[in-house]
Amino acid sequence: MNKLKILDIDLNVARKLGINKVKKYCILPIKEESNKVIVFASKDITDNKEEIEFIFNKKVEIFKVSEEEIEDLIYKSFLGEQENLVEIILSKSIYEIASDIHFEPQREDIIIRIRIDGILVPFAKIKNQEYQKILSQIKVLGNMDITERRKPQDGKAYIKLGDKDYDLRLSTIPIVYGEKLVIRILYGEIFNHDINNLNLSTFQREKLNKMISMKNGLILINGPTGSGKSTTLYSILKEINKNDVNITTLEDPVEVLIKGINQVSLNKKANITFATGLRSILRQDPDILMIGEIRDEETASMAVTASLTGHKVYSTIHTKTPKEVFFRLEDMGVKSYLIKDSLIGIISQRLIKTLCNKCKGIYKEVKINDKFITSYKANGCIYCNYTGYRGRKSVSAVVYIDEKIKILISNIFQEIKELSNEEMILNLRYLIENGFITVDDYNRFLIEEGLNYEKNRIII
């Protein structure tokens, strides 16, 4: 049984026997049909079948599932009956390292989904009256208008679970069947990544070390939304955070707190934008600046100017390839000679989902780069929410803008494209050769990123 079946459960049917009976018998009624009731069970219920048929006044059709699956479904189906529901949902989501929690009103019930590793995973179903209690509690926490249901609202809240503090960003919007609520979880000081987690080759690490050791210049991390740019940026900040430098960041918002670094959040009401904030920070005697994102002409111009006047500047930019970084900066009004003089490195990256170590299975021997390797396939278990995947790895290109590239500045776009494509393919080969990804995902990545599929594909 796939975990997605939680979406098909009729809560009125599932809860009809009560929590004590379903736990005792290791069963869960799923739905009623005209002449029968569908029941999932993890063990023989012959002795209890007659009782269940009497309660429902219908015949019982039994489907066998594993004990861990039935326990998981029972927990998710009866979740809404528990006390401290907000704390339970937040605790479980944080345990799964989820980035967002979605409460989605349907015609009859509320579906809860959580975003893990960039993918929304069905988490539970609760009844509307149970959701209204959650919604009211969250609105109070976020200083939102508890009576307003017709307009979108945004809020912030801070909670403490155990000995850890978490920052929540709250958003409601009216949809057809009620108010949808999304909670974004910011993990603050709980950040376990560093440069060693970035899946860089020895050669890439050497180039990155050169880039971060330079006293001034601009380093940009590029990629689409959700490609891990912020994680890479914070990992670098942890690496360069020393007692003898003044590091100041400007973020929207501050997602990870790092001791010893001065971090500033954008604030529209206080007129702190990327441009105005950067102007003020430059008066604070900074050695190193981190700008969450270069979005407009003024920020781009100031970032380049700062990097040319003795500061080290790190930032992200929304482009797909390293060569597009140059086009984007030029579009923002930065002169090409200033880009050449200021830019010392580009890190271009994507994320690819990795197989669950608990349940992945051997698939077959495949040939890659003139050698045979064992490839693996996704299966699915409770640990990975029955997706077959757990976690993500980055596929990166580290482009060090050295004198060779600066001399060839007239051909820089083609030069950078060739360098970055080659590095991404090497990263990708490492992941397939070490059993992190499937052959299908390997080939799909080549196609999606335009990495010469015909030349580099694995033929099954």
Model-derived features: where do they sit?
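Short, basic, glycine/proline-bearing loop/turn elements
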Residues: N2-K5, Y75-S77, D194, V264
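Long, charged amphipathic helices and adjacent flexible linkers at domain junctions
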Residues: L4-V13, S77-E83, N456-I460
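Short, solvent-exposed polar/charged micro-motifs at secondary-structure junctions
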Residues: A14-K16, I70-S77, Y158-K160, N357-K358, ...
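Short glycine/Trp-rich loop-beta-loop segment that forms part of the substrate-binding cleft
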Residues: K36-D72, L198-I212
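Short, flexible helix-loop junctions that flank or precede catalytic/ligand sites
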Residues: E83-I460
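Charged, low-hydrophobicity low-complexity segments
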Residues: K5, F54, E61-S91, Y95-D100
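Polyanionic, low-complexity intrinsically disordered segments
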Residues: M1-F54, D154-K160, S171
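Short alpha-helical interface patches
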Residues: N2, K23-L28, N57, F63-F78, ...
